[in-house]
Amino acid sequence: MSEQRDILKALAEVLEERRQADPATSYVAKLHHKGLDAILKKVGEEATEAVVAAKGGDRSQVIYETADLWFHSLIMLSACDAGPDDVLAELERRFGLSGIDEKAARNGQ
């Protein structure tokens, strides 16, 4: 397993543990306690911030905001009973497919 996958797996494990924590002491638990809509709102906010950073052209801000987006995406995946390995497996499945072929496979065409 690559170091990148290791850090994603380790972070996902910590986030899963924090999901069960006291919402008064854990940001992750607080988000889960508020429900999926609150998590999705936060993912949307972070996605917007990443887009704005990219538009601004500051590489360090793009990386910083993308890290926030990935962090909150991992929380979303957890809320949906999924994890980074599921997403990585899907990316591996798609690797080598053209976008047109991948879309056709999804649509059963």
From Swiss-Prot:
A GO molecular-function annotation: ATP binding
Protein's GO biological process: L-histidine biosynthetic process
SUPFAM superfamilies (alphabetical): all-alpha NTP pyrophosphatases
Annotated InterPro entries: HisE, PRib-ATP_PPHydrolase-like
Catalytic reaction(s) noted: 1-(5-phospho-beta-D-ribosyl)-ATP + H2O = 1-(5-phospho-beta-D-ribosyl)-5'-AMP + diphosphate + H(+)
Compartments, as annotated in UniProt: Cytoplasm
Pathway participation: Amino-acid biosynthesis; L-histidine biosynthesis; L-histidine from 5-phospho-alpha-D-ribose 1-diphosphate: step 2/9
Annotated keywords: Amino-acid biosynthesis, ATP-binding, Cytoplasm, Histidine biosynthesis, Hydrolase, Nucleotide-binding
A GO term from the CC aspect: cytoplasm
Coiled-coil ranges (or none): none
EC number: 3.6.1.31
Pfam families, alphabetized: PRA-PH
Enzyme class: hydrolase
Top-rank taxon, per record: Bacteria
Main location: cytoplasm
NCBIfam families noted in UniProt: histidine_hisI, PRK00400.1-3
Family that this chain belongs to: Belongs to the PRA-PH family.
Name of the featured protein: Phosphoribosyl-ATP pyrophosphatase
Species this chain originates from: Alkalilimnicola ehrlichii (strain ATCC BAA-1101 / DSM 17681 / MLHE-1)
Gene that this sequence comes from: hisE
